[in-house]
Amino acid sequence: MDYDFKAKLAAERERVEDLFEYEGCKVGRGTYGHVYKARRKDGKDEKEYALKQIEGTGISMSACREIALLRELKHPNVIALQKVFLSHSDRKVWLLFDYAEHDLWHIIKFHRASKANKKPMQLPRSMVKSLLYQILDGIHYLHANWVLHRDLKPANILVMGEGPERGRVKIADMGFARLFNSPLKPLADLDPVVVTFWYRAPELLLGARHYTKAIDIWAIGCIFAELLTSEPIFHCRQEDIKTSNPFHHDQLDRIFSVMGFPADKDWEDIRKMPEYPTLQKDFRRTTYANSSLIKYMEKHKVKPDSKVFLLLQKLLTMDPTKRITSEQALQDPYFQEDPLPTLDVFAGCQIPYPKREFLNEDDPEEKGDKNQQQQQNQHQQPTAPPQQAAAPPQAPPPQQNSTQTNGTAGGAGAGVGGTGAGLQHSQDSSLNQVPPNKKPRLGPSGANSGGPVMPSDYQHSSSRLNYQSSVQGSSQSQSTLGYSSSSQQSSQYHPSHQAHRY
């Protein structure tokens, strides 16, 4: 290419620093980049953006894969990549996303801290239903387009704050996502270890090579249970997250302690799993004879005959071939009973969750526990460091060293920066409901955010994306906010953990 032409092209190229104001507004940090809260300098709009700078020179295969996918994916419940900026002077790459003020990691932490402070404030069941519905809707879109997310967890589920899309769920961190139509080789050969331990399906832990969409469904079941209880259902001690061996004794032990050991009739193909001999050697069925999901959820006041439990049971089915699909889950009776899911998950309530705080450019993101520096490779949206409550909250379950690299809702000790009161529900619940006998369906991003989820708001796309994914190695990615750019994280909930996901 002619040198003069290249120089002219470089001079005309839009530069991030000329277009956006972001200095001093860092909200996330990871080994692969930084995330800033940004606004346009020209004042064309008052919209807030998440501006992610990828560290180093050039761009990784993981980032290439994510960019390629995000440029094709268009859905109200999937984070939108607005633009990519390439700087030829310093060879840096910038990604521009919509900005989400909250995420499920911080929202759940807020409620868990309220329990620790003996002022329990449960997530409203109507909010849980709307959150789950939108997560399923977004995943249904990805699966219909032959995309596996493979790293679903609370930190990667963003929730929009005040604005036109108030309360809208955005699935973020597509750094692990892969197309699954006709892979050249088994996916397990390409990425031996995928998904944060606590949200990893049992077939992955047993070495399944040709895993399917069912791994995302299991992770959604884990998130659903966590929304209902404010505790990670399968939390356990974390070992070396870089291992290429999928078998994880402690994680399987935790799953069996909650669910019980699967009977042969319930999971016939378990004997075909590569790690089944190890399972037989290390575990005894009788150890878990008194364990069941029913007993676990009854402790959290969820009745076994309720529609909420029956759907959870379908999502957390051990046999992946019997696990419910996202499409089937969207049709579940749970979503047909009142209160119906809404486009704005906060419908009828004030938002009590703190906004993200800005990070100091020089201070390390994790000031407390340095073990939290280990994070699984993932991409996340900006999150602000959680504020500390007067008394340090005691986390009921061991907190995950953010394999949730904080997707984050801006921090959240009970009562921190938020209202001391619980969420206040609207007196007229009919305003937020879908007409009777209508199948709820989330509307387009331009829809009235507080309105009911209408069946005809939009149709799911079933067409395949015209994109061939590049193969990533087995390294795990860590994240800077839900705006994904690979980074490593270890899995433990911790009040000070704050990597935002994009």
From Swiss-Prot:
Residues 371-392, 468-496 have a biased composition (Low complexity). SMART domains: S_TKc (SM00220). Residues 408-421 have a biased composition (Gly residues). Keywords: Acetylation, ATP-binding, Cytoplasm, Disease variant, Epilepsy, Kinase, Nucleotide-binding, Nucleus, Phosphoprotein, Serine/threonine-protein kinase, Transferase. The active site is at D151. The modification N-acetylmethionine is found at M1. Its EC number is 2.7.11.22. Changing G28R: In DEE87; decreased protein kinase activity. The keyword Acetylation applies. InterPro entries: CDK, Kinase-like_dom_sf, Prot_kinase_dom, Protein_kinase_ATP_BS, Ser/Thr_kinase_AS. Changing Y32H: In DEE87; fails to rescue neurologic phenotypes in a Drosophila model system; increased protein kinase activity. One of its GO terms (biological process) is positive regulation of apoptotic process. The modification Phosphoserine is found at S449. Changing T196A: In DEE87; fails to rescue neurologic phenotypes in a Drosophila model system. Residues 359-502 are annotated as: Disordered. Belongs to the protein kinase superfamily. CMGC Ser/Thr protein kinase family. CDC2/CDKX subfamily. PANTHER family: CELL DIVISION PROTEIN KINASE (PTHR24056), CYCLIN-DEPENDENT KINASE 19 (PTHR24056:SF570). This is Cyclin-dependent kinase 19. It comes from Homo sapiens (Human).
